[in-house]
A protein has these predicted regions:
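Extended ligand-binding clefts on enzyme/binding-domain cores
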Residues: 1-173
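Charged low-complexity "KEKE/polyampholyte" interaction tracts
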Residues: 172-187
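Hydrophobic, glycine-enriched assembly/anchoring segments
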Residues: 187-196
Length: 196
């Protein structure tokens, strides 16, 4: 099995029998793939395809209203509940927290899908603000909320806010400012679960 699906250009969850037929939206790193497409000694056309597919997947896998991402997804972006996992991987839980970082980084470094990236980050950041920055896990439509909003989420969402920081829309700029300020104000985590 290959690490990337050669037909669609997306990275697989794991290149083995159980994990090659789906992916994880947080694995989508179009900015890195774009760099490889420009600098690789071989297979540049594949890396270009992979960058485009990865960028598209960060839009397709986000919920159309909340902007929330599933932890795992099918190649078409639909949420995927992997039967081998110890929890429901079709919801916003652990891996999904990283998706705003990937969107913000790609927006800043590449600027190839700015309009859609702004739209998806506005939905996501508005959703968390409307939740009062209380919860950390959700069904994708936001109907079931549990767990706590974490320092890691504050950091990831602040990176996603880069997409709104220079917007012509004052409301977008203010939302970005609020997320950056929230990150600045967060106390450094300590203890066993400080990574999250």
């Amino acid at each position: 099995y290959n690490l990337f699906d050669l037909d669609n250009g997306l990275i697989t969850f794991v290149p083995d029998h159980a994990g090659h037929s789906f992916t994880d939206p947080s694995y989508m790193l179009p900015a890195f793939l774009d760099k490889w497409a420009r600098t690789a000694s071989a297979n540049r056309s594949f890396w270009e395809k992979a960058a485009t597919a990865s960028r598209q997947h960060l839009i397709a896998s986000a919920h159309p209203v909340t902007g929330l991402y599933p932890d795992y997804s099918r190649f078409d972006g639909r949420a995927y509940a992997w039967r081998h996992a110890a929890y429901d991987t079709s919801i916003y839980m652990f891996d999904a927290i990283r998706c705003p970082i990937n969107v913000g980084m790609d927006y800043y470094l590449c600027g190839k899908d700015c309009h859609r990236q702004k739209a998806v980050m506005y939905r996501l950041l508005t959703f968390f603000k409307n939740d009062g920055f209380k919860h950390g896990h959700f069904t994708l439509d936001g109907s079931k909320a549990f767990g706590q909003y974490t320092c890691g989420m504050a950091g990831a969402n602040a990176v996603g806010a880069i997409t709104l920081a220079q917007s012509n829309i004052p409301e977008y700029r203010e939302l970005a400012r609020e997320y950056v300020q929230r990150l600045r104000d967060v106390k450094p985590p300590t203890g066993k679960f400080r990574y999250y």
